[in-house]
Structures are given as C-alpha cells and as structure tokens.
Amino acid sequence: MVIANSNIIFVAGLGGIGLDTSREIVKSGPKNLVLLDRIDNPAAIAELSALNPKVTVTFYPYDVTVPLAETKKLLKTIFDKLKTVDLLINGAGILDDHQIERTIAVNFTGTVNTTTAIMDFWDKRNGGPGGVIANICSVTGFNSIYQVPVYSASKAAALSFTNSLARLASVTGVTAYSINPGITKTVLVHKFNSWLNVEPRVAELLLEHPTQTTVQCAQNFVKAIEANQNGAIWKLDLGRLDPIEWTKHWDSGI
C-alpha cells in the first residue's frame, strides 16, 4: 500500500508505539491521518501537524469499549467528511491482569467492534470499495507470557480474529494483517500487574531481556503497511520485521 495521499484511521495512535508510528506515517505523506483515542494529546497532534504540513491530522475522542452503535456513528462522521478511507489501524491495548474484563474489552472486543463498524462502509456486498485493516496484536498471541494469561489470551484472540478477516477478504473485499510487537520500551511494560499477583516482579523480569525501541517498532510497522500482504502475521521484535509462518494443526474443511 502506498501511504502517500491515502486516508488512514488510527485507533490509539497518540501514545507509545502508536505515537511513533503516527510520526512515521506522517513522514510518508498521507492525505489524512485521523486519530481516534481515549485521551486527547494536543501537543502530540500539533507536533504531527508540524512534521508534515501537507498532511491533515484530525483527532476524535474514542473509547473502544463504547457500544457498537456509537462506533458506527463516529465512523459515519469520518466517512461523511473524507468520503473514502484506505486503512484502519486498530491499536488500542492495555496490560494489567488485575483488570480482567477491561483487558478483554479493550484488547479484543474493541478491535472486533471497530472492525465490525467499518464494514458498513467497506463491505463489497453492500457496494463498498473494500479496505485494509492492520490489527496490532502481540507476540504473546504466539506464545503467552504465562504470568499475564488474560493479556496473552486477549492478544491471541485478536490474532485469530485477524487471520479470519484475511480469509474472508474474497467475501468482504476487506484485507487484513496483524502487527505483533515483541517487548518494546514503553510505559506499558515498565509497570504492570500479573494475574492474581503470581509474579509481582513480572515487569522487572521482562525488561531484563533484550527489547526494542518504539521508533524501531514504528519504522517496521510502516514497512508492513507498505508491504500490504493480506493474511500476513508480522513479528516486530528486536528491531526486525519478520513474517511468521502459521502452523496449521486443524482445518474446518469449509
């Protein structure tokens, strides 16, 4: 996918990996970058706008846990304004296994609902033009960090959902791939809670292992966007971008 002159919606593009990815996207010159985030960050929006004045950067407040109808209403506002959207990035995520319901609501249900909502505008069965979805999942969707089983399971669910979306592209006209960062130096991983406090030092122990910067992750994220491979499972770890070959142990046969 060519980022230049495209219209992109980025959910949770104002913090951590998201903000650095927004910076890299803006450098590539899209026509519009629409940021949907729970928390407003005027300084970051001003920075992004100044980084490339040719790009229109717009912000709308959005909590991915709102009812589906509210998400559809927000997307209608955006589509009415832009007319077309080329790429949706679902990036909302939390890491706190004390918050079981919210972890699932943000990391999985929010991705499902935002994706479901945009189908009203993209699905070729309704006369839509199709589109591209990039879902930020995690390497914990491959192999869990067992001390945070709720987080890991939510990311595995998001990965499975994304793989299914890719298989449905011939039906909907919407392609999809997953972005799976490894351990990245963000606020998210500096302090978080394990499930039932099974390992109080989980964040500290995790950071003893090699990590990557948010900039490294963001630069590889943009490479994945440009590659635009339906069904790709991208691992973004230790400053590298690698495709993952998914091992099939069972097939529904349909």
Curated annotation (Swiss-Prot):
Gene3D superfamilies: NAD(P)-binding Rossmann-like Domain
Keyword NAD: yes
Keywords: NAD, Oxidoreductase
GO molecular function per UniProt: alcohol dehydrogenase (NAD+) activity
Binding site for NAD(+): 10-33
A GO cellular-component term linked to this record: cytoplasm
Domain of life: Eukaryota
Residues binding substrate, per UniProt: 138
GO biological process, any: alcohol metabolic process
Enzyme kind, highest EC tier: oxidoreductase
Catalysed reactions listed for this entry: a primary alcohol + NAD(+) = an aldehyde + NADH + H(+); a secondary alcohol + NAD(+) = a ketone + NADH + H(+)
Quaternary structure and interacting proteins, as annotated: Homodimer.
Protein name: Alcohol dehydrogenase
Organism of origin: Drosophila mimica
